[in-house]
Amino acid sequence: MAITAQMVKELREKTGAGMMDCKKALQETNGDIEQAIDFLREKGMAKAAKKADRVAAEGLTHIEVEGNKAAIIEVNCETDFVTKNDQFKQLLSELGKHIVANEPATVEEALQQKLHGDGETVESVITNAVAKIGEKISLRRFEVLEKTDNDAFGAYLHMGGTIGVLSLLEGTTDEQVGKDIAMHVAAVNPRYVTRDEVAEEEVNREREVLKTQALNEGKPENIVEKMVEGRLGKFFEDIVLLEQSFVKDPDQKVKKYVADKGAAVKTFVRYEVGEGMEKREENFAEEVMSQIKK
């Protein structure tokens, strides 16, 4: 398989490894990006965790709580200037209220519903906002959580909504505990609540990478397994909420903080504006020329 410059660029962005190392890794793995990442890690040429996807699109997250239901949404626009616009913020609020009340299953379904059950469709309301504000605006995603009277939501918006986290805790009605967990999730970005949620396939893959790393370091086989288990603990700390040191008190784990409050984390949803979206790249010289020609 031909290795393209774009493939090398993507691998470099994800691993931080050198260009020639990335090219060799792709050649060795027949162009498979995921295998190439493992190859680089086994050789000690890449960081243990992939770099986060480049965040490019603008917009805000918003959280709407109504009784025992709460919705977290992400709405995108083209520039961060628009996120400070009162009309854009009002649109966020209206969309949040609609979604928490109507619980559409998909974005497509939400767009076809009448806003608040009457009048214009959600899609038309967004289209009208585009005409007034002058930028493309889109409802990207949302999730609705439900609780009982004995549970608590935790809502946290970082930097006005560039990151939004909605948590759901059982066994407590203390919203501050929920917010503390939401703040931690915003800061540390775990992927799972408990170890049990991590797929066995993912754990086994990590174990193999760590084992190869240890052997490549020249460690004796009789201590490799112990080393691997030790490093697996760090792997779980990186991705599992309850295994992490609590950001507001690093001397204790999140697990202990929650247990001391008589609570349990049921779930959380974390949205970071634009994650996984690629911004259009333009050559700076070409951009200048295009402005001159106007």
UniProtKB/Swiss-Prot annotation:
InterPro entries: EF-Ts_dimer_sf (IPR036402), Transl_elong_EFTs/EF1B (IPR001816), Transl_elong_EFTs/EF1B_dimer (IPR014039), Transl_elong_Ts_CS (IPR018101), UBA-like_sf (IPR009060). Keywords: Cytoplasm, Elongation factor, Protein biosynthesis. One of its GO terms (cellular component) is cytoplasm. Pfam families: EF_TS. It is found in: Cytoplasm. Residues 79-82 are annotated as: Involved in Mg(2+) ion dislocation from EF-Tu. One of its GO terms (molecular function) is translation elongation factor activity. The keyword Lipoprotein does not apply. It comes from the Bacteria. Transmembrane segments: none annotated. Associates with the EF-Tu.GDP complex and induces the exchange of GDP to GTP. It remains bound to the aminoacyl-tRNA.EF-Tu.GTP complex up to the GTP hydrolysis stage on the ribosome. Belongs to the EF-Ts family. This is Elongation factor Ts. It comes from Oceanobacillus iheyensis (strain DSM 14371 / CIP 107618 / JCM 11309 / KCTC 3954 / HTE831).
